[in-house]
């Protein structure tokens, strides 16, 4: 077997082709640049976020111990071994932040919300979301992520760590305590990432796909942390150069790696919807989008006749495309008044006999320029005019014609 034949075999393999698709999306979304930006934002907002979380916990004394568990979890996750000095400084800054005035406290909250908003915008860009949540809904999501999310995680970590220690002592094998604690940390890291991937993007993300992406990312994070700790313990080049300040570059490198893995997990999660039906192999040209738009509208027309709305999952069962691409088409149709999103799902705004195919073609494939045009524009218009005239029919007429051709 020649090298080209082996290469073609890899391209035909579903797993290899999907992996290459994920790598391409990783590059298209410019994840390393986004991770660098998130690293800088985290440096500015980490202390305010921890301060706001602990301040909220102090309102309810019962949460004090659980908030400490979350801070400890952040220490283990964000600050690698060898950079412990950084977290000592963070704790010192957080304690000093408690002495701020009312205006200073407001600025802490604003800075914290800015970090959450940056995460939200980055995730929405990865899922290719063009429409934002309403302002009030955004605020509620941000506040929940900033307060109740960490507190819930702290509650879970406290119970899990306590159960692990009790189980290890009861079994007479305390040496297993470290492994069980790592498993507990991995579990809650997976839950935290699952919540981020499932609820932060303003896009439908299946729970199972969010879990797969979160689990893979959590394993990568735990492996990276172990390798990072091993490297810092065996190679002390930074220490010989920076001395006591070696913790700072270690911390920056780890933060950048952390965000690269988290955003890479988001890219993987958003790509998983293309696995079914090997949708990752299809091209994303204008003709394909126009065909998909017609399928969407025909499905909504059939649902309208039955008096029901269609959830996003229903479209995916009939159209071989990813949820992010599907969401883009639905949002564009909604912006131009063809459909709208209700509580039960998507609904057609008008009847199929009122939707002109040539208008859809102009919207998704080719729209003649309304302003002054040169000879090239005029020539293209002359070539496209017969096509637009052929498409001078309604969606209902097209549906009848398609069914007639299918029967013949």
From Swiss-Prot:
GO terms for cellular component: plasma membrane. The keyword Cell membrane applies. Keywords: Cell inner membrane, Cell membrane, Membrane, Transmembrane, Transmembrane helix. The chain crosses the membrane at residues 43-63, 100-120, 139-159, 176-196, 210-230, 248-268. Its main location: membrane. Pfam families: Virul_fac_BrkB. It is a multi-pass membrane protein. The keyword Cell membrane applies. It is found in: Cell inner membrane. InterPro entries: UPF0761_bac, Virul_fac_BrkB. Belongs to the UPF0761 family. This is UPF0761 membrane protein NMCC_0461. The lineage of its organism: Bacteria, Pseudomonadati, Pseudomonadota, Betaproteobacteria, Neisseriales.
């Amino acid at each position: 077997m020649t090298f080209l034949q082996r290469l073609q075999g890899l391209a035909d393999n579903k797993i290899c082709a999907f992996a290459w698709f994920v790598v391409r999306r990783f590059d298209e979304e410019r994840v390393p640049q986004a991770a660098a930006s998130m690293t800088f934002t985290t440096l500015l907002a980490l202390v305010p976020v921890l301060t706001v979380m602990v301040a909220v916990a102090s309102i309810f004394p019962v949460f004090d111990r659980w908030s400490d568990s979350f801070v400890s979890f952040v220490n283990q996750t964000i600050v690698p071994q060898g950079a412990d000095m950084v977290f000592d400084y963070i704790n010192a800054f957080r304690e000093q932040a408690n002495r701020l005035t009312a205006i200073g406290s407001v600025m802490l909250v604003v800075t914290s919300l800015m970090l959450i908003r940056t995460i939200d915008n980055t995730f929405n860009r990865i899922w290719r979301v063009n429409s934002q949540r309403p302002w009030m809904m955004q605020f509620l999501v941000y506040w929940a992520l900033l307060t109740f999310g960490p507190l819930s995680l702290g509650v879970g970590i406290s119970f899990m760590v306590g159960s692990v220690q009790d189980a290890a002592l009861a079994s007479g094998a305390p040496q297993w305590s470290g492994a069980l604690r790592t498993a507990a940390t991995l579990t809650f890291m997976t839950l935290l990432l699952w919540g981020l991937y499932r609820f932060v993007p303003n896009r439908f993300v299946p729970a199972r796909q969010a879990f797969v992406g979160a689990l893979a990312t959590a394993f990568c994070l735990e492996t990276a942390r172990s390798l990072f700790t091993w490297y810092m313990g065996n190679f002390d080049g930074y220490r010989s150069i920076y001395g006591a300040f070696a913790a700072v570059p270690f911390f920056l490198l780890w933060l950048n790696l952390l965000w690269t893995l988290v955003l890479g997990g988001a890219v993987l999660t958003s790509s998983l919807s293309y696995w079914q039906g090997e949708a990752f192999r299809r091209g994303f040209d204008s003709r394909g989008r126009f065909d998909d738009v017609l399928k969407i509208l025909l499905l909504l027309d059939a649902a309208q006749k039955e008096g029901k709305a269609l959830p996003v999952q229903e479209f995916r069962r009939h159209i071989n495309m990813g949820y992010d691409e599907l969401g883009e088409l639905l949002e564009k149709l909604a912006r131009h008044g063809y459909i709208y999103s209700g509580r039960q799902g998507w609904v057609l705004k008008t009847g199929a006999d009122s939707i002109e195919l040539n208008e859809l073609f102009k919207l998704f494939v080719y729209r003649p320029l309304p302003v002054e045009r040169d000879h090239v524009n005029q020539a293209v218009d002359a070539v496209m005019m017969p096509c637009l005239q052929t498409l001078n029919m309604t969606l209902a007429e097209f549906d009848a014609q398609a069914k007639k051709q299918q029967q013949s």
